[in-house]
UniProtKB/Swiss-Prot annotation:
Biological process terms in GO annotation: DNA recombination; DNA repair
Name of this chain's protein: Holliday junction branch migration complex subunit RuvA
Record's comment describing the protein's domains: Has three domains with a flexible linker between the domains II and III and assumes an 'L' shape. Domain III is highly mobile and contacts RuvB.
NCBIfam families: ruvA
Purpose of the protein: The RuvA-RuvB-RuvC complex processes Holliday junction (HJ) DNA during genetic recombination and DNA repair, while the RuvA-RuvB complex plays an important role in the rescue of blocked DNA replication forks via replication fork reversal (RFR). RuvA specifically binds to HJ cruciform DNA, conferring on it an open structure. The RuvB hexamer acts as an ATP-dependent pump, pulling dsDNA into and through the RuvAB complex. HJ branch migration allows RuvC to scan DNA until it finds its consensus sequence, where it cleaves and resolves the cruciform DNA.
Highest rank taxon of the organism: Bacteria
Primary gene name: ruvA
GO cellular component: cytoplasm; Holliday junction helicase complex; Holliday junction resolvase complex
Species the sequence originates in: Pseudomonas putida (strain ATCC 47054 / DSM 6125 / CFBP 8728 / NCIMB 11950 / KT2440)
Compartments, record wording: Cytoplasm
Region (Domain II): 65-143
Disulfide pairings: none
Amino acid sequence: MIGRLRGTLAEKQPPHLIIDVNGVGYELEVPMTTLYRLPKVGETVTVHTHLVVREDAHLLYGFAEKRERELFRELIRLNGVGPKLALALMSGLEVDELVRCVQAQDTSALVRVPGVGKKTAERLLVELKDRFKAWETSPAMFTLVSDGPLPVASESSAEADAVSALVSLGYKPQEASKAIAAIKDKAGLSSEELIRRSLKGMISK
Protein backbone atom coordinates (compact mmCIF):
# COMPACT_ATOMS: atom_id res chain seq x y z
CA MET A 1 0.00 0.00 0.00
CA ILE A 2 1.27 3.46 -0.91
CA GLY A 3 0.22 5.82 1.88
CA ARG A 4 2.16 8.97 1.10
CA LEU A 5 4.31 10.43 -1.65
CA ARG A 6 6.88 13.18 -1.44
CA GLY A 7 8.66 14.33 -4.55
CA THR A 8 8.75 16.85 -7.36
CA LEU A 9 5.51 17.93 -9.01
CA ALA A 10 6.36 16.97 -12.60
CA GLU A 11 3.03 17.51 -14.37
CA LYS A 12 -0.32 19.04 -13.51
CA GLN A 13 -3.27 18.42 -15.81
CA PRO A 14 -6.47 18.76 -13.75
CA PRO A 15 -7.60 16.48 -12.21
CA HIS A 16 -4.44 14.42 -12.84
CA LEU A 17 -0.88 15.05 -11.76
CA ILE A 18 2.45 13.25 -11.83
CA ILE A 19 4.87 13.29 -8.90
CA ASP A 20 8.48 12.33 -9.57
CA VAL A 21 9.89 10.36 -6.64
CA ASN A 22 13.55 9.50 -7.18
CA GLY A 23 13.06 9.20 -10.93
CA VAL A 24 9.78 7.27 -10.79
CA GLY A 25 6.71 9.17 -11.95
CA TYR A 26 3.53 8.40 -10.00
CA GLU A 27 0.29 9.40 -11.73
CA LEU A 28 -2.49 10.42 -9.36
CA GLU A 29 -6.00 11.77 -9.58
CA VAL A 30 -6.91 14.40 -7.00
CA PRO A 31 -10.02 16.31 -5.93
CA MET A 32 -10.08 19.96 -6.91
CA THR A 33 -9.77 20.99 -3.26
CA THR A 34 -6.30 19.42 -3.29
CA LEU A 35 -5.46 20.81 -6.72
CA TYR A 36 -6.04 24.38 -5.50
CA ARG A 37 -3.24 23.94 -2.96
CA LEU A 38 -0.60 22.44 -5.20
CA PRO A 39 2.64 24.34 -5.64
CA LYS A 40 4.03 25.17 -9.06
CA VAL A 41 5.33 22.45 -11.36
CA GLY A 42 8.94 21.71 -10.45
CA GLU A 43 8.47 22.30 -6.73
CA THR A 44 8.43 19.72 -3.93
CA VAL A 45 5.05 18.38 -2.90
CA THR A 46 3.70 15.90 -0.35
CA VAL A 47 0.37 14.11 -0.73
CA HIS A 48 -1.46 11.42 1.21
CA THR A 49 -2.59 8.62 -1.08
CA HIS A 50 -5.12 5.84 -1.49
CA LEU A 51 -4.56 2.96 -3.90
CA VAL A 52 -7.49 1.29 -5.66
CA VAL A 53 -6.63 -2.07 -7.23
CA ARG A 54 -8.76 -3.26 -10.14
CA GLU A 55 -8.33 -6.16 -12.53
CA ASP A 56 -7.30 -3.83 -15.34
CA ALA A 57 -5.48 -1.07 -13.44
CA HIS A 58 -3.96 0.20 -10.20
CA LEU A 59 -5.35 3.69 -9.56
CA LEU A 60 -3.71 6.12 -7.15
CA TYR A 61 -5.61 9.01 -5.59
CA GLY A 62 -3.94 11.90 -3.79
CA PHE A 63 -5.07 14.27 -1.05
CA ALA A 64 -3.68 17.37 0.62
CA GLU A 65 -4.37 16.15 4.13
CA LYS A 66 -5.30 12.96 5.95
CA ARG A 67 -8.83 14.18 6.67
CA GLU A 68 -9.50 14.38 2.94
CA ARG A 69 -8.23 10.85 2.43
CA GLU A 70 -10.35 9.54 5.30
CA LEU A 71 -13.42 11.26 3.86
CA PHE A 72 -12.70 9.68 0.47
CA ARG A 73 -12.45 6.26 2.12
CA GLU A 74 -15.74 6.78 3.95
CA LEU A 75 -17.47 7.81 0.73
CA ILE A 76 -16.33 4.87 -1.37
CA ARG A 77 -17.57 2.47 1.31
CA LEU A 78 -21.12 3.59 0.56
CA ASN A 79 -23.31 1.69 -1.87
CA GLY A 80 -23.25 3.24 -5.32
CA VAL A 81 -20.32 5.57 -4.61
CA GLY A 82 -17.16 4.92 -6.57
CA PRO A 83 -13.97 6.96 -6.70
CA LYS A 84 -15.28 9.21 -9.50
CA LEU A 85 -18.39 10.28 -7.57
CA ALA A 86 -16.41 10.62 -4.34
CA LEU A 87 -13.95 12.98 -6.05
CA ALA A 88 -16.83 14.96 -7.56
CA LEU A 89 -18.38 15.43 -4.11
CA MET A 90 -15.06 16.44 -2.59
CA SER A 91 -14.28 18.79 -5.47
CA GLY A 92 -17.51 20.70 -4.96
CA LEU A 93 -17.38 20.83 -1.17
CA GLU A 94 -14.56 21.24 1.34
CA VAL A 95 -14.36 18.56 4.04
CA ASP A 96 -15.93 20.80 6.68
CA GLU A 97 -18.72 21.86 4.32
CA LEU A 98 -19.63 18.26 3.54
CA VAL A 99 -19.55 17.34 7.22
CA ARG A 100 -21.90 20.24 7.98
CA CYS A 101 -24.27 19.07 5.23
CA VAL A 102 -24.32 15.62 6.82
CA GLN A 103 -24.88 16.98 10.32
CA ALA A 104 -27.74 19.20 9.10
CA GLN A 105 -29.03 16.55 6.66
CA ASP A 106 -29.01 19.28 4.00
CA THR A 107 -29.27 17.96 0.44
CA SER A 108 -29.24 21.33 -1.33
CA ALA A 109 -25.52 21.39 -2.13
CA LEU A 110 -25.19 17.67 -2.86
CA VAL A 111 -27.88 17.57 -5.55
CA ARG A 112 -25.87 20.03 -7.63
CA VAL A 113 -23.03 17.54 -7.95
CA PRO A 114 -23.17 15.52 -11.22
CA GLY A 115 -24.58 12.05 -10.63
CA VAL A 116 -26.33 12.95 -7.37
CA GLY A 117 -30.12 13.25 -7.45
CA LYS A 118 -32.37 14.07 -4.51
CA LYS A 119 -32.94 10.44 -3.49
CA THR A 120 -29.25 9.63 -3.75
CA ALA A 121 -28.36 12.72 -1.72
CA GLU A 122 -30.85 11.80 1.00
CA ARG A 123 -29.50 8.24 1.16
CA LEU A 124 -25.90 9.40 1.34
CA LEU A 125 -26.65 11.82 4.17
CA VAL A 126 -28.46 9.16 6.18
CA GLU A 127 -25.68 6.61 5.69
CA LEU A 128 -22.96 9.13 6.52
CA LYS A 129 -24.61 10.57 9.62
CA ASP A 130 -23.51 7.80 11.99
CA ARG A 131 -20.05 7.61 10.41
CA PHE A 132 -19.52 11.35 10.89
CA LYS A 133 -20.50 11.54 14.55
CA ALA A 134 -16.83 11.40 15.46
CA TRP A 135 -15.87 14.07 12.94
CA GLU A 136 -15.55 17.66 14.06
CA THR A 137 -15.38 20.59 11.69
CA SER A 138 -12.23 22.62 12.11
CA PRO A 139 -10.08 24.96 10.02
CA ALA A 140 -8.31 22.84 7.43
CA MET A 141 -4.56 22.53 7.97
CA PHE A 142 -3.19 21.56 4.59
CA THR A 143 0.37 20.58 3.74
CA LEU A 144 0.09 22.01 0.25
CA VAL A 145 -0.58 25.65 1.02
CA SER A 146 0.89 28.13 -1.41
CA ASP A 147 1.73 31.49 0.13
CA GLY A 148 1.77 33.26 -3.21
CA PRO A 149 -0.87 33.73 -5.90
CA LEU A 150 -1.80 30.84 -8.13
CA PRO A 151 0.34 30.65 -11.28
CA VAL A 152 -0.98 32.44 -14.35
CA ALA A 153 -1.50 30.49 -17.55
CA SER A 154 -2.45 31.60 -21.02
CA GLU A 155 -6.17 32.33 -21.19
CA SER A 156 -7.01 29.78 -23.88
CA SER A 157 -5.07 26.88 -22.31
CA ALA A 158 -6.30 27.68 -18.80
CA GLU A 159 -9.93 27.71 -19.90
CA ALA A 160 -9.51 24.51 -21.91
CA ASP A 161 -7.89 22.77 -18.92
CA ALA A 162 -10.67 24.00 -16.64
CA VAL A 163 -13.41 22.75 -18.97
CA SER A 164 -11.64 19.38 -19.29
CA ALA A 165 -11.40 19.06 -15.50
CA LEU A 166 -15.09 19.86 -15.01
CA VAL A 167 -16.07 17.31 -17.65
CA SER A 168 -13.95 14.69 -15.87
CA LEU A 169 -16.03 15.35 -12.74
CA GLY A 170 -19.22 14.49 -14.62
CA TYR A 171 -20.43 17.86 -15.86
CA LYS A 172 -21.57 18.07 -19.48
CA PRO A 173 -19.24 19.99 -21.84
CA GLN A 174 -21.92 22.64 -22.37
CA GLU A 175 -22.37 23.07 -18.61
CA ALA A 176 -18.63 23.33 -18.08
CA SER A 177 -18.16 25.88 -20.87
CA LYS A 178 -21.12 27.92 -19.66
CA ALA A 179 -19.80 27.96 -16.08
CA ILE A 180 -16.37 29.15 -17.24
CA ALA A 181 -17.91 31.78 -19.50
CA ALA A 182 -19.96 33.13 -16.58
CA ILE A 183 -16.85 34.01 -14.56
CA LYS A 184 -16.23 37.74 -14.50
CA ASP A 185 -12.76 39.23 -14.92
CA LYS A 186 -11.26 35.86 -15.78
CA ALA A 187 -8.45 37.14 -17.99
CA GLY A 188 -5.12 35.83 -16.70
CA LEU A 189 -6.62 33.44 -14.14
CA SER A 190 -5.03 30.01 -13.76
CA SER A 191 -6.98 26.87 -14.58
CA GLU A 192 -7.14 26.07 -10.85
CA GLU A 193 -8.79 29.40 -10.07
CA LEU A 194 -11.21 29.01 -12.99
CA ILE A 195 -12.19 25.56 -11.70
CA ARG A 196 -12.60 26.88 -8.16
CA ARG A 197 -14.86 29.76 -9.22
CA SER A 198 -16.94 27.72 -11.65
CA LEU A 199 -17.56 24.95 -9.10
CA LYS A 200 -18.49 27.50 -6.47
CA GLY A 201 -20.94 29.08 -8.87
CA MET A 202 -22.58 25.80 -9.85
CA ILE A 203 -22.77 24.36 -6.32
CA SER A 204 -24.15 27.56 -4.77
CA LYS A 205 -26.97 28.09 -7.29
